[in-house]
């Protein structure tokens, strides 16, 4: 089997895990923003959030829609061109489509809460660097060039690893954690539920993209060493951007149930985990005690059956299997 050799027939699948673990799980978890009531969040925004809390939430939400547009384009425009296997193509197309659901949902949250200054937000240095990083990690080879050229495979491998591990697996996680933490105080339930579904989507996308990189390394063993330096440098850059972003959103102080210090060390831990998922050793030291105070978020990202910490009924990865009536929750 070779990842870059075009197969005419739809089946048999040569890489069935991208159907069963990628496409199928995403299809089972499909959701829309219209499923989530927001009236309670509007009341919280107008009556129950402090100025510091509103500053944090507003800064995060304004950046979400823009970043998701870049992510969607990568799956549908790049991955489908590189890997001419239907099981991978249909997974990438569905992942890209789900990112448009995220972008629409985040825009809906912004509109609902009256957050409309997208242009001003994009001029913030901490935000602009995030957007730039998302759009720069790409490569314009096609599958025929990848089959023949080790240079092409190195460039695409680096791009795929950086995108999957750090863009999908790290870059928005500090924001997800902050927004979901409000449910500790029974606030912003609609936003919290959207974060829950978004995190599970992004965790799946990151997992499958990292797996695709490892498949490349299995078939072309020289790739892992060739790409290592660039991937470690990208990890450092991603972490620096996240730490700067955390400073920006916490510039008016910590939240009641979440500190900037704890979140920063959780992000160190998170990026180490993604390096391991790519097949590399952890690279960053961190305060284990501080990162452990966000263990509740690890459960959210895992996508496995668990009892939710914030009075939401037990869930599994598949939203369709949750059997929940959201009107009961809200």
Roles of regions detected by a PLM:
Residues 1-330:
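Non-heme di-metal
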């Amino acid at each position: 089997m070779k990842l870059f050799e075009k197969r005419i027939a739809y089946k048999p699948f040569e890489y069935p895990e991208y159907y069963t673990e990628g496409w199928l799980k995403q299809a089972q978890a499909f959701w829309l923003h219209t499923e989530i009531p927001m009236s309670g969040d509007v009341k919280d925004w107008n009556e129950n959030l402090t100025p510091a809390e509103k500053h944090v939430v507003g800064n995060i939400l304004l950046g979400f829609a823009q970043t998701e547009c870049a992510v969607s384009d990568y799956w549908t425009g790049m991955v489908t061109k590189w890997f001419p296997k239907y099981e991978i193509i249909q997974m990438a197309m569905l992942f890209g489509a789900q990112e448009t659901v995220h972008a629409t949902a985040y825009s809906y949250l912004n509109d609902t809460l009256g957050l409309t200054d997208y242009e001003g937000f994009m001029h913030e240095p901490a935000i602009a660097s995030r957007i730039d990083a998302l759009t720069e990690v790409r490569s314009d080879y096609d599958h025929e060039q990848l089959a023949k050229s080790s240079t092409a495979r190195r460039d695409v491998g680096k791009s795929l690893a950086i995108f999957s591990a750090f863009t999908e697996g790290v870059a928005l996680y500090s924001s997800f954690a902050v927004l979901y933490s409000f449910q500790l105080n029974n606030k912003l339930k609609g936003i919290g539920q959207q974060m829950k579904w978004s995190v599970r989507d992004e965790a799946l996308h990151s997992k499958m993209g990292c797996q695709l990189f490892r498949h490349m390394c299995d078939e072309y063993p020289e790739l892992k060493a060739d790409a290592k330096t660039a991937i470690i440098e990208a990890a450092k850059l991603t972490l620096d951007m996240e730490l700067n972003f955390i400073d920006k959103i916490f510039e008016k102080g910590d939240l009641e149930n979440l500190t900037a210090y704890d979140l920063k060390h959780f992000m160190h831990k998170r990026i180490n985990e993604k390096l391991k998922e790519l097949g590399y050793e952890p690279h960053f030291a961190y305060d284990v005690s501080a990162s452990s105070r966000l263990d509740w978020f690890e459960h959210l990202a895992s996508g496995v059956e668990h009892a939710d910490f914030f009075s939401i009924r037990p869930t599994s990865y598949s939203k369709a299997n949750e059997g929940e009536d959201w009107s009961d929750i809200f």
